[in-house]
Amino acid sequence: MQREEGFNTKMADGPDEYDTEAGCVPLLHPEEIKPQSHYNHGYGEPLGRKTHIDDYSTWDIVKATQYGIYERCRELVEAGYDVRQPDKENVTLLHWAAINNRIDLVKYYISKGAIVDQLGGDLNSTPLHWATRQGHLSMVVQLMKYGADPSLIDGEGCSCIHLAAQFGHTSIVAYLIAKGQDVDMMDQNGMTPLMWAAYRTHSVDPTRLLLTFNVSVNLGDKYHKNTALHWAVLAGNTTVISLLLEAGANVDAQNIKGESALDLAKQRKNVWMINHLQEARQAKGYDNPSFLRKLKADKEFRQKVMLGTPFLVIWLVGFIADLNIDSWLIKGLMYGGVWATVQFLSKSFFDHSMHSALPLGIYLATKFWMYVTWFFWFWNDLNFLFIHLPFLANSVALFYNFGKSWKSDPGIIKATEEQKKKTIVELAETGSLDLSIFCSTCLIRKPVRSKHCGVCNRCIAKFDHHCPWVGNCVGAGNHRYFMGYLFFLLFMICWMIYGCISYWGLHCETTYTKDGFWTYITQIATCSPWMFWMFLNSVFHFMWVAVLLMCQMYQISCLGITTNERMNARRYKHFKVTTTSIESPFNHGCVRNIIDFFEFRCCGLFRPVIVDWTRQYTIEYDQISGSGYQLV
């Protein structure tokens, strides 16, 4: 190691700093505990750059180890210093090297006989404990290669995985689990890694990672019988509370005092926690009459309600308007009843965890009533050969592309449990276990252009966006079908608008040229309120579909990027972003971009470059052999 490296790292100056923050001691009065940040654990301050060169020849071996002065340390060891000998604070050289991430010194000391699991310091900890608590993944990997045991407990009863969890070192938690540590391991006080993460770490990780490893969310600790949800409430950890509720944490679990998480939230008068915990109870059917409880407990029924409500609402809006009733007061009361019904269904049965169900229901309902209108209102008025036949052919293509967009694999990146653990170990041991390329939810190395979808909760290759209108992500596996869906949907809507205008021309005694715009609008709305309602739906859908189709085609053909990449280009190092443009390494010219995206082939005249984006980890791929297209 170069000597200058020591001046740009953090150094711990004494073992008393190891226990600045409470560790794994029994917590006898959880209601009095304040949440503490893992960033303030007293391990030392960043060292500034030296303005002069010290005479290292006068340094003792502890100071030289802390600063990583390899030559001075070797000089003293060769002169007879015993590397196993603890200093006056009962701390060994291996501890000091581990806490300050001096990998070359660790290798040297172990080669000279240092004991890798020697206990030391006030907390009677191993060097691996010190490295873990400080968050040095590379040091953890190195020590475990030399046989360090992560399951050993320190003086407070914690093993390494508990320290990593409570200090938010997600990469170390992942590595320890991948190396065989039990995800539900309890410390001496009965606290699991999940409990520590819920109590100490106010971010999604490592809690999210632990949940992905199928941790037991409803275990209680040894002393208080608090579950992870109890500890999250005690700490006011709203981020983790949401994760635990999504993972199925038992909101009614009671601790040794008979208190639920909701009881603790009420004691703290935290409105956010109280509301979310009550909503979680209601979602499980508690606090409601028995009949509603049974229905609300049925997730499939709730999904059907969300899908079916738009069918009812769209029909009722048009039906009420079409009623032969002159009194708008009566119609207003009827619309009020529709609104009240929707509010009741929304509060009682809508499951907001099913993000796509309602938009998908709106799309399906709109198209259903449009087709009903087409066949029952337009069929006898329009020419079969020139209108109905093309419309039906377009509908077949629309249904096909919609079905493929909805139900096909968008490019989910899959891996077995063993593959996930192998990936974690490989990335950690090569110094690449970075959350920018590793997904802590799916536990996979993220291919280039991929992204974890928060709605679907899975990583998607060449992720474009999550589309609620098709109830699926749009990615490498279904993006072409999604474009086909937009294209044929736009034509279907155009035909619907044409049908409405033709219907008014045949059945309504008014014309735009004769009566003017406003009179024409009021006349056609009065002539057939249902038709006018369908026309408004068609115009609304035409606007967003047309805009979306144009944006998608521009991104695909002219920019060579996805929607996600365009929105987050500054986050990705491989994009060159200016105030006016985005330069993409995946942009190979308009014609080639289109051929590659749609995989066009034409009798050998051109052929696309096919890339498996589920396995592509770099921006370099063979563009020459595929050559995009060739003119013959």
UniProtKB/Swiss-Prot annotation:
It comes from Homo sapiens. This is Palmitoyltransferase ZDHHC17. It is an enzyme of class 2 (transferase). Residues 11-305 are annotated as: Necessary and sufficient for interaction with DNAJC5 and SNAP25. The DHHC domain is required for palmitoyltransferase activity. Belongs to the DHHC palmitoyltransferase family. AKR/ZDHHC17 subfamily. It catalyses: L-cysteinyl-[protein] + hexadecanoyl-CoA = S-hexadecanoyl-L-cysteinyl-[protein] + CoA; L-cysteinyl-[protein] + tetradecanoyl-CoA = S-tetradecanoyl-L-cysteinyl-[protein] + CoA; L-cysteinyl-[protein] + octadecanoyl-CoA = S-octadecanoyl-L-cysteinyl-[protein] + CoA. GO terms for biological process: axonogenesis; lipoprotein transport; positive regulation of canonical NF-kappaB signal transduction; protein palmitoylation; regulation of ERK1 and ERK2 cascade; regulation of modification of synapse structure, modulating synaptic transmission; regulation of neurotrophin TRK receptor signaling pathway; regulation of programmed cell death. One of its GO terms (molecular function) is identical protein binding. Autopalmitoylated. Autopalmitoylation has a regulatory role in ZDHHC17-mediated Mg(2+) transport. The chain crosses the membrane at residues 305-325, 326-346, 358-378, 382-402, 481-501, 530-550. The lineage of its organism: Eukaryota, Metazoa, Chordata, Craniata, Vertebrata. InterPro entries: Ankyrin_rpt, Ankyrin_rpt-contain_sf, Palmitoyltrfase_DHHC. ANK repeats lie at residues 51-86, 89-118, 123-152, 156-185, 189-219, 224-253, 257-286.
